[in-house]
């Protein structure tokens, strides 16, 4: 059963958004009437929103999982909220959610996308999760130059860039792509150096922790990913020595592989997640 009634205590003590949350960005849960013994925590990426994860959430629910998809503070509202939130807020809301799930379920898995994979790694290094899925992991982002971003952040709070909606992507949230315009206006038509600094913090921590993870881990690289570097995925996967580590490369997939241009690539990504968690 789908519900947008998520535990608000996960956000206690964190940045409180001033802007309204768009419909697509609402946190949601999918819970069985008879409580499942297994749960999965889905974590979206940088300037992302829960609606991007509707497809894997639906399939995981149908496979018997209770599904939890929290919205990260500062995202899905306004650019002002984004720059006022921090990596601490993003990480802590997921940590709070995971702690609760570990107390309530026999097994808990994490499925994360893009920057969410960095949060997933950090959580898996501190908590006992059953499986960890890292889709289009943000190990390296060719356009992100930490030194240059640090310099720009001294002088620029907001750099405008060109953006337009791409109807080729198959978004699965109700009413899609109704919220693309407002999210594009607030997030995707801007570079916020201060927010990127927060992403870099997570990236540094996750890369340091990844080789020491013991959780069974699936890494999914997308051949046409123009945001993160798919060639780095297998290289970094080899650094992990404990537990099962599986790396797959999906042809024709883009960075947004859970609502992709290619239905075949999207299906392959979701199938890989389900098979790994089964």
Predicted regions and their residues:
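Gly/Ala-rich beta-loop-alpha elbow adjacent to hydrolase catalytic centers
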Residues: 112-116, 120
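Conserved alpha/beta-hydrolase
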Residues: 60-79
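Active-site nucleophile elbow and catalytic-triad environment of alpha/beta-hydrolase enzymes
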Residues: 25, 192-210
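Active-site nucleophile loop of the alpha/beta-hydrolase fold
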Residues: 133-144
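Catalytic histidine neighborhood in serine/cysteine hydrolases
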Residues: 234, 238-256
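Catalytic histidine-centered segment of alpha/beta-hydrolase-like enzymes
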Residues: 253-266
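Short beta-strand/loop motif that positions the catalytic acidic residue
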Residues: 213, 219-221, 225
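Short alpha-helix in the alpha/beta-hydrolase fold that links the catalytic acid
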Residues: 56, 215, 229-238
């Amino acid at each position: 059963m789908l519900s947008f009634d998520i535990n608000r205590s996960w956000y206690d003590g964190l940045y409180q958004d001033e802007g309204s949350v768009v419909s697509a960005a609402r946190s949601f849960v999918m819970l069985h009437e008879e409580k499942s013994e297994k749960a999965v925590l889905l974590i979206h990426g940088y300037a992302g929103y829960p609606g991007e994860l509707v497809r894997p959430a639906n399939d995981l629910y149908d496979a018997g999982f209770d599904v939890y998809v929290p919205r990260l503070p500062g995202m899905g509202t306004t650019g002002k909220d984004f720059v006022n939130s921090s990596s601490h807020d993003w990480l802590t809301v997921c940590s709070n959610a995971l702690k609760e799930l570990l107390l309530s379920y026999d097994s808990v898995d994490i499925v994360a996308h893009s920057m969410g994979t960095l949060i997933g790694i950090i959580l898996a290094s501190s908590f006992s999760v059953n499986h960890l899925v890292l889709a289009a992991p943000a190990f390296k982002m060719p356009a992100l130059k930490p030194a240059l971003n640090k310099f720009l952040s001294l002088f620029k709070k907001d750099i405008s860039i060109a953006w337009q909606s791409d109807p080729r992507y198959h978004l699965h949230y109700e009413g899609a792509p109704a919220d693309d315009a407002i999210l594009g206006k607030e997030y995707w038509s801007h570079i916020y150096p201060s927010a990127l600094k927060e992403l870099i913090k997570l990236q540094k921590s996750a890369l340091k922790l990844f080789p020491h993870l013991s959780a069974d881990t699936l890494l999914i690289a997308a051949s046409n990913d123009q945001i993160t570097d798919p060639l780095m995925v297998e290289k970094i996967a080899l650094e992990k020595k404990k537990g099962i580590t599986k790396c797959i490369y999906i042809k024709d997939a883009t960075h947004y592989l859970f609502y992709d241009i290619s239905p075949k690539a999207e299906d392959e990504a979701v199938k890989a997640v389900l098979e790994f968690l089964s």
